Regions:
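Catalytic-site microenvironment of enzymes
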Residues: 1-236
Length: 236
């Protein structure tokens, strides 16, 4: 064997060894995606948090686009499946809370499913609606430092929320409506996993509603979320 061939083989093997930890790190991350809502709401009640006497509706069907007439549960699944594909193409393992619209999974059950799956990150996909057609923009929701139910993941969830928001805004150009600290969200309170809830935009705004249903904009939405996930994982 010539010295040249030996050198090429050495460099190739060294490169593989050096690359292995990076690929292993990616492959060890399980990302959980929860496309919000479902085709039929469930008006039954469930505890808003473990041991809480406060109860809320299990799950609703969400809002509806004023221009597209598309339901929120349709939009979130549409984008969620594209996010799944994008992450899998990068080597991540993905757990989908739902892959069809005709399901009956409460917000508490969604969180428990992701806890049991052993997820690294849990992202909940939603879209906003309000009685003001001019309001637009994106926001993320997470728990506050004073929330007694989320102490183990509050700080990491706060950072994850900021990372998702900043990268989503950068990719889409959407108006940044900031981080909203909420302690009344069932899915957040039951989660033992670093998590965030993103509101893509307002389906009550005709322009934003139409935009969120275009393939081009959905690609930007997905790219932003992937970038946010990878930013968090790099820096955690």
């Amino acid at each position: 064997m010539t010295k040249g061939i030996k050198k090429i083989l050495y460099l190739a093997v060294t490169g593989l060894i050096m690359a292995a930890p990076l690929n292993a790190a990616v492959n060890n991350e399980l990302i959980c995606i929860d496309p919000g809502h479902q085709i039929r709401g469930n008006s039954g009640l469930e505890e808003v948090a473990p041991g809480s006497s406060v109860k809320k509706l299990k799950v609703s069907s969400g809002t509806r686009g004023v221009a597209t007439k598309k339901y929120e549960y349709q939009l979130t699944l549409e984008v969620g499946l594209k996010l799944r594909d994008a992450l899998q193409n990068k080597g991540y393992k993905v757990f989908m809370v739902r892959e069809t619209n005709d399901v009956d999974i409460s917000n508490k059950e969604r969180a428990i499913k992701t806890n049991n799956a052993g997820c690294t990150l849990y992202i909940r996909l939603h879209a906003d609606g309000i009685n003001n057609s001019s309001t637009q923009g994106t926001s993320v929701l997470t728990s506050s430092p004073k929330n007694p139910y989320t102490k183990s993941v509050q700080k990491s969830s706060d950072k994850f929320s900021h990372d998702i928001l900043s990268e989503y805004v950068k990719a889409t150009g959407a108006k940044n409506r900031g981080v909203s600290y909420r302690d009344d969200l069932t899915g957040t309170n039951w989660s033992k996993v670093t998590n965030t809830l993103i509101e893509f935009g307002f389906m009550s705004n005709p322009e934003e509603d139409r935009k969120m249903s275009t393939p081009e904009y959905q690609t930007k939405m997905v790219n932003g979320m992937v970038n946010g996930i990878e930013k968090y994982l790099r820096e955690k």
